[in-house]
Amino acid sequence: METGLDFSVVWTNITYFMIGRYPSGPIGGVLLTLYLAVISLIFSFFGGLILGLMCVAKSRYIRYPTLAVVNAVRGIPLLMVIFWMYFLLPFVMGKIVPESWTVITALSLFTSAYMSQIVQAGIEGIPRGQTEAALSTGLRPWHAMVFVVLPQAIRNMIPSFVNQFVSMIKDTSLAFIVGVSELTHVATQVNNRTMIYPAEIFLFIAVIYFIICFAFTSLSRWLEQRLAWRKAI
């Protein structure tokens, strides 16, 4: 009886794991996972930034409704948000929405809610004297926030941003539930076709997820060190 792991199924399907059916068909696998992650990262960064600024707004008519929405979204499982976007977006827009964009919308909304709390904490961590000094030079409150407080706060937010972004990269695996052919979905398809190599297949995709997350973490650490070096100068 043969023992040990046999990764031949991985090497046989390596192209499918990496890019799906592209170029003869739609992209999939690792390429689609990166696409979902990068687009969602961009949207959630700016979404979280806007929501975070609204959470610290002086007007209670802006601050309280924003906090209510953010806390509501944070209290809902991501899987439910994906299902809601999958069924609601086509109804609201009146046309068919690609499954990948329903997932991007769900990931962006969900992560933006968590990002907003990071932004809020980062802004509130800056000494109030910074704002007062900026206002004393004649800057308006909004300009003081954008040009003085926020740049300092973002440097302090980077580690928390990275943790949230890495979590979101792993959360792209939930896209398989609505039929998006990202890495987990592709691995499930290959496993269902072969039926005898589940350990090898899912060990392989675990390594791929680790490499993606490690690469992003290393890049962010380099960026953090770069910003710290420039600040020291």
Each language-model region and where it sits:
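Transmembrane alpha-helices and adjacent helix-loop boundaries
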Residues: 1-233
